[in-house]
């Protein structure tokens, strides 16, 4: 902006000033003062009056004050001159460039930089000595004060009577006061080194490499900056170089370095309009950190731009780390889910501060100015427990993914899920969880996820960290900071980057690094066919002996292992049990609601003897979970009996318990796994379990407690042969699938019907009413998408949100069940081809027609391809409605 005038304009203004004030000699006197001040710059320091003479109006040559206005052409004039021009010419044109101004004088903005400079001059100490007590040093010959007006930049504008004076509006000139800018001049420091940080040499140093500073013992070395804990960059006799910190005694320490950070990655935003308050940068750029916004975001400045950026993208120096720690938000009340491993062991290199001493003061002044301005645009992180905050925030805000939120990004390209900003997705994917079992036999102690309290409102007893993930695929690192993934191993996730990459550490080796997020899945949502063996409570590190059952409340969910969580199967009763109590049965379509959550002590006290189990089983009906073999596990689970808690009426106490023996496990790759939900084992389809509130099996009646073991074995052999026949016939129709874990959704209504009746046989058609604890798409769910009614409900992530139990389900009920109804469909056209990345996904080719059945909140759709009739998942951005 132009503050000085050419002498042509000055001559015109001289007449106006003489006419208004009657002082014709004033312009000439002012010119003489300016020339004298310029000449005095060669021998003495420029005083305050000479500085103020440079800040004058180019029309009237009067000193500018805070009422000066800036025109759209960036020229600044005093208010009185602008008003006189409007009164005389009835329009406002710039006296310098003659550009017409379309607004009034009152609507013009003030010169903010001028206001700050004037304020700094007023606050400047007027004493004859400097703040340090020594007389003010004189500048070296030939140096003018013009660089101080431009933030230390070069140029001597305004030093000659014929040149205009400019004030730069760049970000480098946003100093808090003129005093801070004046101290950045290096010439006074050369005369008086006590004003600069310096140290005294304790030993002589000859220098070992080019660029080292040589000095002798006793030399006074000016310290320019601190490279790291071991080295300084200093100056001695006009020579600069590096010197070891142990060789000098620091007498005047370096000032506090400005909080800065070095960009580790490129940070760009796709939606410029929505994310206009984000600060974009490229790798290796140096940012100035202003303040912390929330757990994962900070506000910074790069050049003349101010915005927020993710902390994971920037390597902070010590000052920035202290600033971030100072502004760290208070942890939530229930913060046990946020436990994490120690961070990376690699030391963070300090970023070299700016060599000018005024940069720290300028940044601090700028920070104070913008601190209140950006509060209205701050973005918040939402943990898995802050349900109230999640529900109250707008979905348009950017929400930082916490390490406690088990969000799985199912995509081959980790950058494809960079924009996960939907608030409801976080509320669905990160429910609070309870611990159901604490006993284990493996040497690695890993927290195991169990059932979820969900929406019942029951407070959780024990919080479980959700940042333990299982590797679904092997990954070879491509860069030095990446972590190698081994399929089936466990990893602790420390941070989640916006581009879909995770930062974590291996629980086996402790090595940390970054890896793609779609290669791992949370332990709490590992599918039943996961890579690890399901574990039960053990005694002495081995499974329980035959005939011993483990009792637990169904509210406790499951006995989870490192790799998978075994869901509790719903109890199965016999026709005899229903015939005794026909009036106690709610409608068949109702579901079991868990009304109580277990404590950790209940889970630990589940191991009991056979006699104790039988005594407990006489109080409440029991259901059994048969042994289940995973794909990679050679071991089997012992029989587990579950009893409904505060749901079953005491009048059923006469029902005898059923004791189970381990049976040959059925691999999940068989047809039974494709048609059996993960919370009902394949052995249950053959009628092993007896005594439960729902489901009917006509194969056998429950025996009393005095039944001998050999009789049971003979019955089981017959049932086993029947089951194998059924599986042999179904295996030709079904294809085993092992889809990856996906984010859960909430369905408001669920209708369960006889899908198994046509796939396996009428014998197991009664086993159709149950709740599914997970949300992995299985074969039966894919059949439901093709037009059949779904076999089970998806009630949130690990949420067994059932209604009341069904006490009666005779075989005759199957005849009056409603017919399967078609799911809603929407026609979509594929606009971009998409290759499937897992068995749960379908291949899309450009131009294909897809019938969409469900739109998930993470942007993925489930639908059926018209070309081949296949049903599966695909990203919604690859299709369009028509």
UniProtKB/Swiss-Prot annotation:
Asked if the record carries the keyword Zinc-finger, the reply is yes
Q: Where is this region: Interaction with RAC1?
A: 369-439
The UniProt subunit note reads as follows:
Interacts (via SH3 domain 3) with PAK2. Interacts with RAC1 (GTP-bound form).
**Comp. bias intervals (Basic and acidic residues):** 708-721
Q: Does the keyword Transferase apply?
A: yes
For the region Disordered, what residue ranges are annotated? 18-42, 124-159, 368-399, 433-458, 575-664, 693-747
Query: Any idea where the SH3 domain is?
Result: 194-253, 256-319, 464-525, 823-882
Q: Where are the zinc fingers (RING-type)?
A: 57-98
Functional summary from the UniProt entry? Has E3 ubiquitin-protein ligase activity.
| Protein name, per record | E3 ubiquitin-protein ligase SH3RF3
Q: How is it modified after translation?
A: Autoubiquitinated.
The entry lists its GO molecular-function terms as: ubiquitin protein ligase activity; zinc ion binding
Q: What is known of its domains?
A: The RING finger domain is required for ubiquitin ligase activity and autoubiquitination.
Q: Which UniProt keywords apply?
A: Metal-binding, Phosphoprotein, Repeat, SH3 domain, Transferase, Ubl conjugation, Ubl conjugation pathway, Zinc, Zinc-finger
Reaction catalysed by this chain? Answer: S-ubiquitinyl-[E2 ubiquitin-conjugating enzyme]-L-cysteine + [acceptor protein]-L-lysine = [E2 ubiquitin-conjugating enzyme]-L-cysteine + N(6)-ubiquitinyl-[acceptor protein]-L-lysine
Where composition is biased (Polar residues), the residues are 433-444, 575-588, 596-635, 697-706
Q: Which PANTHER family match?
A: CAP, ISOFORM AC (PTHR14167:SF116), SH3 DOMAIN-CONTAINING (PTHR14167)
